[in-house]
Swiss-Prot record:
It comes from Oryza sativa subsp. japonica (Rice). Keywords: Cytoplasm, DNA-binding, Flowering, Nucleus, Transcription, Transcription regulation. This is Nuclear transcription factor Y subunit C-4. Probable transcription factor involved in the regulation of flowering time under long day (LD) conditions. Functions as a repressor of flowering, independently of HD1 and GHD7. Controls flowering time by negatively regulating the expression of EHD1 and HD3A. Component of the NF-Y/HAP transcription factor complex. It is found in: Nucleus; Cytoplasm.
Length: 250
């Protein structure tokens, strides 16, 4: 029987003392695999910064999630482009300015709520009525996109909350959306794309909270398909005013 070629564990002496401590003992090895010894005492990162370091399964999950997310974005972008093209054609072909979807008297009353407004022309409420109609239609379309992503057939108020948090021009509506609706079903998915692997949590867009249980690079399943990771909206004011954990325990 040949002697083992593995080095025997060394005995180290700590400077300034007489007590002897055994050095790190290598893990048991098999003939076909080398021993794995930690390179240093510093803790390894929670996830690799280089995608090449991921396992084949994680790479496949990330690629599927990224592909699904890109296809979903392209489909939704086409829907929005078609929506605005139809609205422009509708505006250009409008000849009836007497019948409107929204009551002009109610719109005029809202406009007069501003004390600085003294006189309102006859065509101003007409423009506001059309603008409000388009606003409702677009917000409904964006909300319905979130409904379909979650494999549902009924538009709910948390879908509207998702549409608001996803769209920059709807930021002025964030404060009127209940926080319970923002937290439901991963509301607030960013539209810029999937975050790159290895990016720390503090580099995500301001105002988005990454759930701790969500593994970076892993996708959320939507009806058997791999989807994009979810993000939850966190109120910036609450982020600043939230006391440290030590103070809360007191």
């Amino acid at each position: 029987m040949e002697p083992s070629s593995q080095p025997q564990p060394a005995i180290g002496v700590v400077a300034g003392g007489s007590q002897v401590y055994p050095a790190y003992r290598p893990a048991a090895t098999v003939p076909t695999a080398p021993a794995v010894i930690p390179a240093g005492s510093q803790p390894a990162p929670s996830f690799p910064a280089n995608p090449d370091q991921l396992s084949a399964q994680h790479q496949l999950v990330y690629q599927q999630a990224q592909q699904f997310h890109q296809q979903l974005q392209q489909q939704q972008q086409r829907q929005l482009q078609q929506f605005w093209a139809e609205r422009l054609v509708d505006i250009e072909q409008t000849t009836d300015f007497k019948n409107h979807s929204l009551p002009l008297a109610r719109i005029k009353k809202i406009m007069k709520a501003d004390e600085d407004v003294r006189m309102i022309s006859a065509e101003a409420p007409v423009i506001f009525a059309k603008a409000c109609e388009i606003f409702i239609l677009e917000l409904t379309l964006r909300s319905w996109m979130h409904t379909e992503e979650n494999k549902r057939r009924t538009l709910q108020k948390n879908d509207i909350a998702a549409a608001i948090t996803r769209t920059d021009m709807y930021d002025f509506l964030v404060d009127i959306v209940p926080r319970d609706d923002l937290k439901e079903e991963g509301v607030g998915l960013p539209r810029a794309g999937l975050p790159p692997l290895g990016v720390p949590a503090d580099s995500y867009p301001y105002g988005y909270y990454v759930p701790q249980q969500q593994v970076p690079g892993a996708g959320i399943a939507y009806g058997g398909q791999q989807g994009h990771p979810g993000y939850l909206w966190q109120d910036p004011q609450e982020q600043q005013e939230e006391p440290p954990a030590e103070q809360q325990s007191d």
